A protein has these predicted regions:
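Conserved SAM/SAH-binding beta-strand->alpha-helix loop
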Residues: 51
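Class I S-adenosyl-L-methionine
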Residues: 144-192
Length: 192
């Protein structure tokens, strides 16, 4: 970790992006991040994860696959997003974030109105956002916040569009645990 992370860490200060760039927020063990990087070698993927065990796991996946199109932010994604340029991202993923299911903890949820506004700032018009959760209340909560303000449009046309994993989805260890109170739900949005 001490040798690979410094070369992949997103530097402090304003982030300069070139070419197509995707962001995975809270990449957990890094399985999805590494798989997307492998499937899309012409895309730069940035992963943000505050927990050291997740970062170490992602580094292992990146090293084993010899990936050269990944950058990592080992901290709170909000610190990174405020440094990203307007419209710099073409895609973002928020997959199975901590649901904070108790009402008194809802203020700790990642998906809040201010955060959605910051995401809208950094995702270019026409760019996409995927949110997935296995907690019904968090799905409802997030859907309402992503649709508020008209910055994102939900792309679903039929029930199957959110009840099954998208074709390009990579299942993670966390997702396999099925810790939530419902089957996984996948919400795809486009930046208006």
């Amino acid at each position: 970790m001490e040798t690979l992370l410094p070369s992949l860490r997103v530097p402090d200060g304003p982030v300069e992006l070139s070419g197509e760039t995707w962001l995975e927020i809270g990449f957990g063990g890094g399985e999805h991040l590494a798989a997307q990087a492998q499937q899309h070698p012409d895309v730069t993927l940035i992963g943000a994860e505050p927990f050291q065990n997740g970062v170490a796991s992602a580094l292992r996946h990146i090293d084993e696959a010899a990936l050269s199109n990944v950058g990592l932010h080992d901290g709170d994604v909000r610190d990174l997003i405020e440094r990203l340029p307007e419209g710099g991202l073409s895609r973002a993923f928020i997959l199975f974030p901590d649901p904070w299911p108790k009402v008194r903890h809802h203020k700790r949820r990642l998906v809040q109105s201010d955060f959605v506004g910051e995401l809208a700032r950094v995702i270019r018009p026409g760019g996409t956002l995927r949110f997935a959760s296995d907690w019904a209340d968090y799905v409802d909560w997030s859907l309402a916040r992503f649709l508020a303000g008209g910055r994102f449009a939900w792309t679903a046309e039929a029930c199957a569009d959110w009840t099954g994993p998208p074709a390009d989805h990579v299942t993670t260890r966390y997702e396999e645990k099925r810790l939530g109170d419902c089957a996984p739900v996948f919400l795809d949005f486009v930046r208006v």
